[in-house]
């Protein structure tokens, strides 16, 4: 089966987060020689398929095995859940159609096209050396993500089945297939700052203390400020105010406080502690409360790593494009792999219609993506 046929089948399952809709049974049927592990909570389902090709004799011996003889373990990772399709599609979003060289359907780009490509590549992979190939799939990436990839990796750690390397099939490309590889992601820190004042009548300014005036005095040091200068892999960390709230809605009452909600997307140079230190210095003599919560940590996979190099070589060979190695964009499940010390990068389809009406992926793109993934498998197994 090729990537197109598999992707068409995957799209036909209406797997809106966290619904799995039986799609894992179909995927398991494609890999009868692979072992499976499944887990999940709160309606989320996760599937892990794995097979050891050409296991070394020492590995076969089980408890009598020598140490350090495990074959390289490579994992393809992705999600089968999709966001709700919304209205005004030209066709049923869960009945894939082919039109003018494109496959239309919810998840075509994000990320059933990528999953279909790596499933097809895995079916056609036949290494001659010891190699452990696995696939990790979740029904909760578009949602909270608490019981998805994160949970499955914790289970794999308990069973000593964590991979050495992984590719997450996120739709990373911007204009042409192969123009972008994510070799890391920025971290994300959410914050709430409350500046306190004294509520009162606007006609008696000496009896009140307006916290909005206080905010105005420090706003240039908070809003849009760069927290570091970045580096070759990361843009400068930046604090962005996303919401302001103050007052009772009356035009003659000054507020007792002003609440500022913000987010900082940050590089390895900035941490929650360094952000707190900076803000406390700015707010030193002002009555306030500050809350910070890190929702994800930044990570980077070396541009010269074996995984990055093999992927880059195969993109250049197959797509005739030199990919840009970058860390742009929001968070993804790749962060959960990195947290376990797993070498991880992200590569997948063009992302011009992700989460949009009439989501689509080109047929040529699926063909090339499958070839890239198969080339990566062959390159790693021959290394």
Curated annotation (Swiss-Prot):
Enzyme class: hydrolase
Cofactor binding, per record: Binds 2 Zn(2+) or Co(2+) ions per subunit.
Pathway in which this enzyme or protein is active: Amino-acid biosynthesis; L-lysine biosynthesis via DAP pathway; LL-2,6-diaminopimelate from (S)-tetrahydrodipicolinate (succinylase route): step 3/3
Active-site positions on this chain: 81, 141
One Pfam family from the record: M20_dimer
EC number: 3.5.1.18
Binding annotation for Zn(2+) 1: 79, 110, 170
Catalytic activity annotation: N-succinyl-(2S,6S)-2,6-diaminopimelate + H2O = (2S,6S)-2,6-diaminopimelate + succinate
Molecular function, one GO term: succinyl-diaminopimelate desuccinylase activity
UniProt-annotated binding residues for Zn(2+) 2: 110, 142, 355
Gene Ontology BP terms: diaminopimelate biosynthetic process; L-arginine biosynthetic process; lysine biosynthetic process via diaminopimelate
Keyword Amino-acid biosynthesis in annotation: yes
Swiss-Prot/TrEMBL keywords: Amino-acid biosynthesis, Cobalt, Diaminopimelate biosynthesis, Hydrolase, Lysine biosynthesis, Metal-binding, Zinc
Cofactor(s) needed: Zn(2+); Co(2+)
Biological role stated in the UniProt entry: Catalyzes the hydrolysis of N-succinyl-L,L-diaminopimelic acid (SDAP), forming succinate and LL-2,6-diaminopimelate (DAP), an intermediate involved in the bacterial biosynthesis of lysine and meso-diaminopimelic acid, an essential component of bacterial cell walls.
Subunit structure as annotated in this protein's UniProt entry: Homodimer.
The family this protein is said to belong to: Belongs to the peptidase M20A family. DapE subfamily.
Stated name of the protein: Succinyl-diaminopimelate desuccinylase
Source species: Helicobacter pylori (strain P12)
Primary gene name: dapE
